[in-house]
């Protein structure tokens, strides 16, 4: 039995708003999980130049030193990498640069196909708008203290201004849900 059925069975009919909240939370969680799963399937960052070298020469190092543990073989490989001639090392570095540029291109294409993140909530939108102003007024404060100041400003903000941010968020989230429905 899934968590949604447990939630719906455990409350009475008078708790309809709670059902909607539970449903919304589960959908948001599912949407985030789906996005994270898609991201995991994306292109992987290429390995370093040293690991390219290690892949090419590991079997040779194992043949030369069959009794050594893998950590000791890696240590030998690291020492040989450090003492490697510049032109040979450059071959691996340029190969890594080539792989990295291919990765960046594939990553950009992949990221364009991902659904965007959910719109920021009302407080986050407000915080983003006033952050630079608050930081300029209090340059000696830590990030945590500055965020507390922004939180206090939000709490003391006139409700009509808060409602403006809330309405903008509701509109943005409706557009987001319409454009990227959760099946």
Swiss-Prot record:
Residues 43-111, 116-183 bind DNA. GO terms for cellular component: mitochondrial chromosome; mitochondrial nucleoid; mitochondrion; nucleus. The keyword Magnesium does not apply. GO terms for biological process: mitochondrial chromosome packaging; mitochondrial genome maintenance; mitochondrion inheritance. One of its GO terms (molecular function) is DNA binding. It is found in: Mitochondrion; Nucleus. The keyword Glycosyltransferase does not apply. Its main location: mitochondrion. Keywords: DNA-binding, Mitochondrion, Nucleus, Repeat, Transit peptide. Pfam families: HMG_box (PF00505). Residues 1-26 form a transit peptide. Disruption phenotype: Has a temperature-sensitive growth defect in glucose-rich medium, with slower growth and smaller colonies at 37 degrees Celsius but not 30 degrees Celsius; the phenotype is suppressed by overexpression of YHM2. PANTHER family: HIGH MOBILITY GROUP PROTEIN 2. Specific binding to the autonomously replicating sequence 1 (ARS1). Interaction with regulatory regions: probably involved in compacting the mitochondrial genome. It might play a positive role in gene expression and replication. Present with 3810 molecules/cell in log phase SD medium. This is ARS-binding factor 2, mitochondrial. The lineage of its organism: Eukaryota, Fungi, Dikarya, Ascomycota, Saccharomycotina. The gene is ABF2.
């Amino acid at each position: 039995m899934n968590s949604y059925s447990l939630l719906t069975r455990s409350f009475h009919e008078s708790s309809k708003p709670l059902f909607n909240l539970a449903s919304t939370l589960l959908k948001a969680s599912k949407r985030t999980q789906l996005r994270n799963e898609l991201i995991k399937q994306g292109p992987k960052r290429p390995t370093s130049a040293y690991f390219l070298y290690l892949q090419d020469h590991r079997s040779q190092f194992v043949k030369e030193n069959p009794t050594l543990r893998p950590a000791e073989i890696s240590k030998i490989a690291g020492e040989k990498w450090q003492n490697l001639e510049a032109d040979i090392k450059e071959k691996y570095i340029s190969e890594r640069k080539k792989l990295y540029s291919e990765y960046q291109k594939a990553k950009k294409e992949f990221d364009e196909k991902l659904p965007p993140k959910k719109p920021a909530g009302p407080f986050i939108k407000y915080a983003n708008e006033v952050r630079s102003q608050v930081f300029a007024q209090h340059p000696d404060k830590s990030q945590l203290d500055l965020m507390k100041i922004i939180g206090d400003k939000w709490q003391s903000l006139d409700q009509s201004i808060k409602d403006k941010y809330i309405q903008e968020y509701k509109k943005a989230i409706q557009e987001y849900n319409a454009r990227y429905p959760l099946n």
